[in-house]
Amino acid sequence: MTTAVPDSRIPAAVHRRRWVILGVLMLSLLIVVLDNSILNVAIKTISTPAPTGLGATQSELEWAINAYTLVFAGLLFSAGLLGDRLGRKKVLLGGLVVFGVGSALAALSGSPGELIAFRAVMGLGAAFVMPATLAVLMNVFERDEQPKAIGIWAGGVGLAIAIGPITGGLLLDHFWWGSVFLINVPIVVLALGLMLWLVPDSRDPDPGRIDPIGVLLSVVGLVLLVYGIIRGGQLADFTDVTVLATSAAGLAVLAAFVVYEKRSDHPSIDMSFFRNKVFSTAIGVIGVVFFALMGVTFFSVFYTQTVRGYSPLQTGLLMLPLAVAQLVFAPRARLAVDRFGNSAVCTAGMTLIAAMLAAFAVLDADTPIWILEVVFFLMGVGMAHVMTPLSVVIMQALPREKAGSASALSNTFRQVGGALGIAVLGSVLSTAYRGGIEDELPAGAPHAAAESIEATLALAARLGERGEALVTPAHDAFLHAMHVTALCGAGVALLGAVAMAVFLPGRPRGGQEGKEETELVAADH
């Protein structure tokens, strides 16, 4: 492996153990990503009536996911600034403790409302963990090693995505649904011990001031907007006064947030960053990737478990190709960038993601399962060749001491993109499903029975023999809704591909290309 000369700002002792530190940082990252990937497998179980689950409706499931995501996204900037000011290690340790406590409380939830609240607590902790891991990484690696380290760090996301659904499936096969949250606690304890022992502290010598007004405006605006979108899907009526009013209020508050940030002398988001088209495109497309990914993951669980009849563990195994592809290709994506350039590699990766999203529109109840496996694998290949290069572009666009802010900005767009993906594509799914099943429901059926396939099948179970006639129409209506939703996600992904083709830089210069390729190849041996 190539060993670079330590930067004068990096102590020699820290430089020597930088790869071990990277491993500890990946463990902390693993906890945050693992939780969301585990939850993806558990959403069907949580939607099952008590005592098996909590009987959560589709809109409550969307909020259980988005309560975490919105708090996470809204506090990332403040978390990054606190890390810059107080020290990234201290903030990382505090975030892990809060995340662990939130996980234990979520496991003991007695209702969907409690689960939503405790997921928000978990989001609070995660907001301090995610940016701190990447900020510490940027302060223990030299600039020429950062792409390699970020590639491995991104591969850790793939590892978490790989083991999350499988772990969740194993837990749900043997324990109650709350075990998918309780599993976080021992991992948090292990990470805290290693962090105290190995990870150095770092801070920005000239940190910015906290921006409480900006944080409040961003969180309130996002919550109102997402509420309006989810409510529209729940009612299957986006012209409802409540839906229009809350969505418009959310957009107005977000507009006020942008105006305030431009005028503030200590903004959460430095709007001058977005004058750089490359930086803006990279940040925006990261949001688009997570918009599509979170939406597809949401409906694919119901497709595999409800329509195809697979268990949670089998569903986790079915998702393995998606994660394996990311794990294998993320650390090597930089080689493709060195050869072909960011624009070509990222555009091709995003186009592949769009094609695989569109492929869901041809899946039905008896499609050979190997086709789904190929779709998941190729989607993972596409993600690896988009996320890793874009992460490098974003992190290297700012000085080392601003690493916390760059990481927070990147992760904010991921989380906001994912939240909007769940809200928008979840609402498309709900609206399309209601349109396909409403005429099949018996007279007097509750309005909620048409909100999701799980609600319809629960009604069918209560009706006994009379309800058996609802099963096939429910499956057919869900498949139609999944096809519509997948095509919407594919369209959004294609817009991201076009943006990257236009704005991202092309192939690097020869000298730099050769140097980076030599180091990356050496790292792989």
Predicted regions and their residues:
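Hydrophobic transmembrane architecture of multi-pass small-molecule transporters
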Residues: 11, 190, 393, 413-505, ...
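Transmembrane core module of solute transporters
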Residues: 18-71, 176, 213, 227, ...
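Residue-level signature of the transmembrane alpha-helical cores
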Residues: 28, 94-98, 102, 118, ...
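Transmembrane alpha-helical cores of Major Facilitator Superfamily
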Residues: 30, 66, 70, 97, ...
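Hydrophobic/small/kink-forming positions within alpha-helical transmembrane segments
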Residues: 73-74, 104, 162, 219, ...
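Helix-loop-helix hairpins in multi-pass membrane proteins, especially solute transporters
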Residues: 81-214, 218, 312, 366, ...
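C-terminal membrane-cytosol helix-exit motif in multi-pass small-molecule transporters
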Residues: 186-203, 221-230, 249-263, 497-504
